[in-house]
C-alpha cells in the first residue's frame, strides 16, 4: 500500500497503515510464507478487522527488504485493540517466532491516511510508492485535489492515496504517495500520456513548490487477507 495536519497527533478517526518490511532469503521463502498461511488460518486471526497485504518488492533502491506486510486498520483504536487481542496468544507467538527464524525485520513504519482517489483492488494490485518531503501539506493536498477532480484525471486507471509518516520511516520523508493499478506498465503509459499535456505539467510544477520527491518503491501484492475494504478508509 496516503493529512492536512502537520502535527503527529490524531485529530479525528483516520485510517492507519502499519508497514513491516522484511528481508527473506530465497531458500527460506517457503517456510516464511508457510508461517503466514498458518497464522492467517488460525482462530486468533478470525478476529482481525483490518486488511493485510503481503507485498513483493520489485525495486526499492539500496533498501534490503524484498517483502513487506502492509497492515491497514480503519483507525488507531482498532490497531490498538488488535494488538491487545493478539498479545500473549499461542498463535501470535508462534507466528512471530517463525517469521524471525526465516527472515529479518528491516523496518516498521506507521502511516496515517490523508486523502485518496480512484478504485483500489483489495486482492491484487501493482503499487508505486513515491517518498516525499512536503513543506506545506495543506497546500500540497489542495493542489493534488484540484488535479484529481479535473477532467485530466477522469479516466485515471487506478488509485492515488497520500499517507503521512506518523512513526518510524526514513529521515526526511514525511509523506508517501501510493499509486495503485492493474500493472506498472498501465500506470507508466498513462503517466507518459499525461506528461504531454501542458496543464498537467503546470499542475505538477505547482506541487513541486511544496513537495520534494526523495525516492520510489515498486511492489506488487502477492496475497491479501482480512475483511476491510481499502476503499472505505477515505
Predicted regions and their residues:
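Bacterial N-terminal signal peptides
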Residues: 1-8
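Short S/T/G/P-rich N-terminal loop/turn motif that feeds into the first structured element of a domain
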Residues: 12-234
Amino acid at each position: 500500500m496516503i493529512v492536512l495536519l502537520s502535527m503527529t497527533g490524531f485529530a479525528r478517526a483516520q485510517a492507519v497503515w502499519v508497514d513491516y518490511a522484511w528481508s527473506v532469503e530465497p531458500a527460506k521463502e517457503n517456510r516464511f510464507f508457510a508461517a503466514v498461511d498458518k497464522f492467517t488460518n488460525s482462530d486468533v486471526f478470525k478476529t482481525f478487522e483490518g486488511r493485510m497485504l503481503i507485498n513483493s518488492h520489485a525495486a526499492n533502491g539500496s533498501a534490503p527488504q524484498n517483502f513487506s506486510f502492509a497492515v491497514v486498520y480503519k483507525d488507531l483504536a482498532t490497531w490498538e485493540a488488535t494488538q491487545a487481542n493478539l498479545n500473549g496468544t499461542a498463535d501470535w507467538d508462534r507466528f512471530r517466532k517463525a517469521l524471525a527464524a526465516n527472515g529479518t525485520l528491516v523496518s516498521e513504519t506507521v502511516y496515517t491516511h490523508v486523502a485518496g482517489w480512484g478504485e483500489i483492488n483489495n486482492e491484487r494490485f501493482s503499487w508505486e510508492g513515491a517518498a516525499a518531503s512536503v513543506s506545506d501539506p495543506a497546500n500540497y493536498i489542495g493542489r493534488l485535489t484540484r488535479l484529481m477532480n479535473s477532467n485530466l484525471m477522469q479516466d485515471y486507471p487506478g488509485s492515488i492515496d497520500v499517507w503521512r509518516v506518523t512513526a518510524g520511516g526514513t529521515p526526511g520523508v514525511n509523506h508517501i504517495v501510493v499509486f495503485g493499478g492493474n500493472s506498472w506498465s498501465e500506470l507508466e503509459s498513462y503517466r507518459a500520456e499525461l506528461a504531454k499535456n501542458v496543464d498537467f505539467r503546470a499542475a505538477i510544477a505547482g506541487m513541486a513548490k511544496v513537495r520534494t520527491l526523495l525516492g520510489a518503491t515498486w511492489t506488487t501484492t502477492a496475497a491479501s487477507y482480512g475483511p476491510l475494504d481499502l476503499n472505505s478508509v477515505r
